[in-house]
């Protein structure tokens, strides 16, 4: 069904990414506050990133409190809008799929194509902003670790490898009462991969820890050593989360060379040079990371878990389900983080 009647009122721009704008918006019928991401499809790479995000989020059959929820995706062409469905044979949708596959525009360039993603609205910025503008809090650290491990276990259970986990891509929803810890939501699935079943039993879900990918992508300071090589599985997400948790616990920061913004992220220091952890481990798999770097002491189990997550050998890292269980055990069995 094609319609020209808008369902949403855009209130203000709240974010600007590499391939789209994000607005705060209201649902006209209910007044519900939502986030709307607008992506112009004038470049094949924009189309590919947008479709990857759509395919990943639309493949999820249930919701998780720590994963951004896609309410709907609307395709707009020259003023006409249509709700986009995965696998649709729509004359508006198919040219976008062809553009993504071929790497060149497969529709009339005179037409204006846009994709609108309607998602949860998060009012607390991203994880970088939240952590780095507040005093260190054990309670917050514990809450965030449990939320992120739960989100990753959910994604891997749904055969989704994120491939670009970093604090910038983790959004914060403030608690209503201002007392409880905020809710984190993993977002930005433009580089994600939905693993499909293969082998003798196509009905059996794909094992993301045995599904090998070859496209080296992500953000260098969070990339696992095997991603730099171009042969990796979902264990690369475990490594990225290890960098995030390590940086959060010790307030380790890097500086974005373009924006000069301080970001949570781990690194290896070589003289005046700052090297991503994954790159350093690729060059020297026997490199022993200094964990903790800043704190005088760190919980023994947490220290051991971080070293496992950041192992150069992906086989030595826990999978997402093991990680979630280990963090629950650390959070609820150890009453102090200092022993």
Swiss-Prot record:
> Main localization of the protein?
nucleus
The Protein kinase domain extends over 8-332
Sorted alphabetically, which keywords does the UniProt record give?
Answer: ATP-binding, Kinase, Nucleotide-binding, Nucleus, Serine/threonine-protein kinase, Transferase
CDD domains noted in UniProt: STKc_PDIK1L
Q: Where in the cell is it found?
A: Nucleus
**Residues where ATP binds:** 14-22, 37
Where exactly are the transmembrane stretches of this chain? none
Report which reactions are catalysed by this protein.
Answer: L-seryl-[protein] + ATP = O-phospho-L-seryl-[protein] + ADP + H(+); L-threonyl-[protein] + ATP = O-phospho-L-threonyl-[protein] + ADP + H(+)
Matching entries from Pfam families are given as:
Pkinase
Record-linked SUPFAM superfamilies: Protein kinase-like (PK-like) (SSF56112)
A GO molecular function term, named singly, is: protein serine kinase activity
Q: What top-level branch of life does the organism fall under?
A: Eukaryota
Q: Does the keyword Iron apply?
A: no
What class does this enzyme belong to in the EC scheme?
transferase
- The positions flagged as active site in the entry are 164 (proton acceptor)
GO terms for cellular component: cytoplasm; nucleus
Q: Does the keyword Kinase apply?
A: yes
Instruction: State the similarity comment.
Output: Belongs to the protein kinase superfamily. Ser/Thr protein kinase family.
Report the protein name in the record: Serine/threonine-protein kinase pdik1l-B
Q: What organism is recorded for this protein?
A: Xenopus laevis
Q: What is the lineage of its organism?
A: Eukaryota, Metazoa, Chordata, Craniata, Vertebrata
